């Protein structure tokens, strides 16, 4: 080591100035306040904030002009803007809190990197933080070290590195001063890459790239420049929200001007606030205020469930996208398999005993396995030691006197051990190399067995030995003759076996119309064998090597072996461009571009590197494919729940808009004489009433729907998130909205007629309107609350078991209870503009509940008719 002369202090400074520091910026946590502010980018939220400001202006000006300081109307006017504002803030808090929690969960899973490395500088070999390494530095490496930067090998003493995080190759790579590999950058054996681990030997290399200029750094830059993904539902809701907002804004202007004209432009100062409140009420009716809030609540509850199931969702919307996945491009090692080599079979030749084979494998082995399970060394050698029962082998009687390390050219490892006056040569390696070195052996006897195991994806190691009575390690001729005239002992077969639950998870994918695709850096035979065993592959013609891949035929294959990161990206893009929703699993730096490009990137939490975790949308903390499938099922449930809640939201928005419009211009004209005599400016529903309907009516059922277990077998049938209201959904929304608006107006009118004819109520236009509003308020809100039960099942409610939907029943009845509090408790009735002392008017109570029962009855009749025609 003393022959290496390192950089001087001046050269270090010059190199750092020219090439930069050896640092890769980690993705910082987005501050909570910034996440909170980002929630306000929605046009719906902006419009609601404008409505808040306008309502506040009206409250202040009206209060000052009318001297309402001690009037109950001041409370009513001030309630409206703050209810709208609380709605906006609640939504923003829910979304930002959950995303911040998910960020922190993902951040805690990041792995710790080696902080120091050994560098030759002008003062000799020193230990320095990896961040101080510069281009031109000479680095010393030995087993266990993490390579701190990219570089070129200067000296290699049986140097072997694990580069699976970058290349996908599951076995260590032999490194040498001269390239003995391919021409591709990652195939060159004389190059080292930042983040790789030295698993055997030692070496020296010169740093050629640091920080963002390393191979890892280049991938980081690709990941950081990626755009934020929107889920299919988010994309639809963004369009729907804009449509509702612009439509509402247009109607706001029209209704304000028309109503002002009807009231009289000549008295603008007295009438503008009345017209403005009516227009704001219309905007509040049109905009489904709970649109974002309830979706975030449903997403958050689903995310919590999945966190308990070992899946950490970094972004709320990813849960819904996961439910719509049609293609899963999954890695093999560690995801479908256990990421742990195991001996699955062995063969003892002739008179060899299992003890003989075991002893030879222990002696020709450089790995260590402690009693507590900790291990170091080559994964294959570790697997051999874990398989063997070393008790009784008397290994302490043998002393190793010589080793000829494994290298990729010879494909052999040899050791000489001494016991008493005998020297025993033990050789292990590939069958095709070792069998010809054995004496008295017809390799054709062994070859069929080995070929069969190889075709099943097993890695086979042959073992041979011979006994010498003298051995001189300094004698070159003796050393060269070691690997000859061997006695064949037998062989062992190893495999990274599939996880127990993987096969069932793959079967669940097929049943759910999801296509699993294996993309691996491993060998084709190994990948094919595992894929066939798990059910991914039925025809071997659907498996292909990366070098043979034709981009135009990507969708014909189900297994891709020995692929490059660029090819993995091409595979993902091919399926996406064909219109499929694609999930990708990965754990290495090489997987990061595909994780970003996919619709849902799933990174393994245990084996995943930080860059892959940053790129992913979901972190699978138990590295299990079955967890991804569980996530898809939860995602489907989430989408179904969102669809049901959105149906109810749109139902009340459409019905409420129709009621407010027709109420202002039809009921206002019909009852003009009675209202004008009573000196009252007519208004159908206040903004506060509509907000109560849009929030509390849907709030409890929305949470209940999210918690309620879904009875449908969602993973046993095709599923799509492409259409929000498919299978009659759009038609049902239209006719139910028309029905609900008709019934609301009908019972609103009946309530007003009753009040007009009542000796006490008929004296006040305000009381006449409150009587109608009480009935209409209950019909619109109560019907929407109970409609959540209708949405749970296609069959009539009378034909279902209430126990199966107990949580939704509780949610619906909780909403009804809120309405009862408002209409029966006088102070609340005052604030929300309903009639006080309703118990004195049982007819109005009958109207209120009669309209709800009529709506539900008509829905039940429609279901019965559909059931009789077999269209449910």
Swiss-Prot record:
List the catalytic activities from the record.
Answer: ATP + H2O = ADP + phosphate + H(+)
Q: Where on the tree of life does the source sit, at the highest rank?
A: Bacteria
Which EC class does it fall in? translocase
Keyword field: ATP-binding, Cell membrane, Magnesium, Membrane, Metal-binding, Nucleotide-binding, Phosphoprotein, Translocase, Transmembrane, Transmembrane helix
Query: Which Pfam families does the record cross-reference, listed alphabetically?
Result: Cation_ATPase_C, Cation_ATPase_N, E1-E2_ATPase, Hydrolase
**Compartments in which it is found:** Cell membrane
Does the record's keyword annotation contain Transmembrane?
yes
InterPro entries in UniProt: ATPase_P-typ_cation-transptr_C, ATPase_P-typ_cation-transptr_N, ATPase_P-typ_cyto_dom_N, ATPase_P-typ_P_site, ATPase_P-typ_TM_dom_sf, ATPase_P-typ_transduc_dom_A_sf, HAD-like_sf, HAD_sf
Q: Which residues form the active site?
A: 331
Residue ranges, Extracellular side: 63-79, 258-275, 663-685, 748-768, 825-842
Q: How does it sit in the membrane?
A: Multi-pass membrane protein
Q: Would you identify the family this protein belongs to, as annotated?
A: Belongs to the cation transport ATPase (P-type) (TC 3.A.3) family. Type II subfamily.
- Write down what this protein is called: Probable cation-transporting P-type ATPase
Question: What is the species listed in this Swiss-Prot or TrEMBL entry?
Answer: Mycoplasma pneumoniae (strain ATCC 29342 / M129 / Subtype 1)
Q: Which gene encodes it?
A: pacL
